[in-house]
Amino acid sequence: SSSGSAVAVAKGLISFSLGTDTAGSGRVPASFNNILGYKPTRGIISNRGIIPACRSLDCVSVFGLQVSDILEVLLVLEEWDPQDPFSRKKKILTSKSFPERPKVALLEDDQLDFFGDSIARKAYDKSVSVLAESGLYPDTVDLSPFLEAAELLYSGPWVAERHLATSPLITDSP
């Protein structure tokens, strides 16, 4: 997980940090620390040198306090790396890569579960209002396809890929 990277930004020790993200290990610590965590499109940032969890899904993630900070980091790091098979030759980012009014995905009401915690529900509703007031565009999404993808990650073919990626490390450094 990249929790240390998230904490360092949240505490103001640094203005941005890098981590890794396969299935949320960059974005989840960011959310727990009230900062932004961004998992870029595969191949924008080279993965050379990271210890793989699931090579086809791993990405270097970026943590920051503002979208503009994250974009600046991405613009610097976006380079083709001939030693990374997923690296992209064509640059796709520009200073205008993020929309002025970004869309924020929210779960449909029938998919929300606060486990009976009315305080958490009120905090969620207030957060949605703050997002809308801050210029972001809240939009609802169906969680079902994401749950199906997660099932594949933890019970499907990617389990074998993770085993292949991590076996040499475990064998060499028990």
Where does each model-flagged region fall?
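Short, solvent-exposed loop/turn segments at the edges of secondary structure
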Residues: 1-3, 30-33, 40, 54-58, ...
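Predominant activation on well-ordered alpha-helical scaffold segments within soluble catalytic domains
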Residues: 6-10, 39, 68-75, 125, ...
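Short acidic, glycine/serine/threonine-rich loops at helix termini
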Residues: 27-32, 49-50, 116-118, 151-153
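Short helix-loop capping/hinge segments that flank enzyme active sites or metal/cofactor-binding pockets
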Residues: 98-107, 153, 157-174
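Acidic helix-start/capping segments at beta-turn-to-alpha-helix junctions
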Residues: 144-156
